[in-house]
């Protein structure tokens, strides 16, 4: 064993065992020569003990570098996995927000579309109402009660019962399935009867079928059969619901002229 090896082996001992035994002159010279040779090998880098120590240190270094490299690889992989997880979560959140925003925009547009359609429907209803009002010509034409007070209504005469204006409005101005087949000559006779004080015998004979429908058991000039009145009112309401916009300009002018005549008679 060389001196360097003994130094490493006995570095923890308090005293060198060689110091316990005194050396002779020959042993000292031999020991000195051994140390000088060992120092020379250390300088030249050929000392076995030094080379073994360097190899051991090199192996320890390589092991530590390998451990450090593995730890670095583990951290890189862990960071990559966390990055992918966070990117996936961020992408899902982005898609969810885009979908929510799209639904909100579509809902807002549908609401605006619904309001526009409602406004259009209200405008159409208003236009139809304006058309009905133009056809009615006046509120007196709609309110039948204002036209029921006829001249000489209280005069109890045994003459042929004349038709009331309500009957004329209900069965001629607003024709039904039953009155649609009435000939035009009969309608003209009814108009003349309304405008005259007393009907002629021919007009009375033409008007008698209509009179039996409206006034089965008359007691005075203003009383009518309730069933005929109800039916006339229903027919009038159906005609109004269907809309009066289908009337021609000739019908409107004729109705206005008739209304003016009735008002002139009352005056």
Curated annotation (Swiss-Prot):
Q: What is its main location?
A: nucleus
Biological process, per Gene Ontology = negative regulation of transcription by RNA polymerase II; transcription initiation-coupled chromatin remodeling
Keyword NAD assigned: no
Example of a GO MF term? histone deacetylase binding
What does the entry list under GO cellular component? Answer: chromatin; Rpd3L complex; Rpd3L-Expanded complex; Sin3-type complex
Transcription recorded as keyword: yes
Sequence ranges of Basic and acidic residues compositional bias: 221-241
Location(s) in or outside the cell: Nucleus
Q: Where are the transmembrane segments?
A: none
Q: Where is this region: Disordered?
A: 208-252
Domain of life, source organism: Eukaryota
Q: Which UniProt keywords apply?
A: Chromatin regulator, Nucleus, Repressor, Transcription, Transcription regulation
Q: What does this protein do?
A: Component of the clr6 histone deacetylase complex I responsible for the deacetylation of lysine residues on the N-terminal part of the core histones (H2A, H2B, H3 and H4). Histone deacetylation gives a tag for epigenetic repression and plays an important role in transcriptional regulation, cell cycle progression and developmental events.
Protein name from the UniProt record:
Transcriptional regulatory protein sds3
């Amino acid at each position: 064993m060389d001196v360097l090896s003994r130094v490493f082996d006995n570095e923890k001992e308090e005293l060198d065992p060689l110091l316990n035994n005194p050396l002779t002159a020959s042993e000292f010279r031999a020991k000195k020569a051994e140390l000088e040779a060992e120092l020379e090998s250390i300088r030249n880098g050929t000392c076995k003990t030094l080379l073994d120590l360097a190899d051991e240190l090199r192996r320890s270094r390589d092991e530590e570098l390998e451990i450090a490299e593995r730890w670095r690889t583990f951290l890189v992989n862990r960071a990559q996995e966390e990055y992918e997880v966070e990117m996936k979560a961020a992408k899902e959140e982005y898609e969810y927000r885009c979908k929510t925003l799209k639904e909100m925009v579509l809902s807002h547009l549908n609401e605006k579309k619904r309001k526009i359609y409602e406004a259009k429907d209200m405008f159409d209803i208003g236009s139809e109402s304006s058309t009905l009002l133009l056809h009615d010509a006046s509120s007196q034409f709609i309110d039948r009660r204002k036209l029921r007070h006829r001249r000489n209504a209280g005069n109890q005469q045994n003459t042929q019962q004349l038709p009331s204006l309500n009957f004329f409005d209900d069965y001629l101005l607003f024709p039904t399935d039953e009155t649609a087949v009435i000939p035009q000559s009969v309608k003209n006779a009814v108009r003349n009867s309304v405008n005259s004080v007393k009907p002629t015998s021919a007009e009375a004979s033409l008007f008698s079928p209509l009179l039996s429908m409206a006034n089965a058991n008359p007691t005075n000039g203003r009383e009518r059969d309730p069933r005929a009145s109800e039916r006339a009112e229903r027919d009038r309401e159906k005609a109004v619901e269907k809309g009066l916009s289908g009337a021609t300009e000739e019908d409107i002018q004729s109705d206005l002229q008739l209304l003016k005549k009735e008002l002139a008679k009352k005056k």
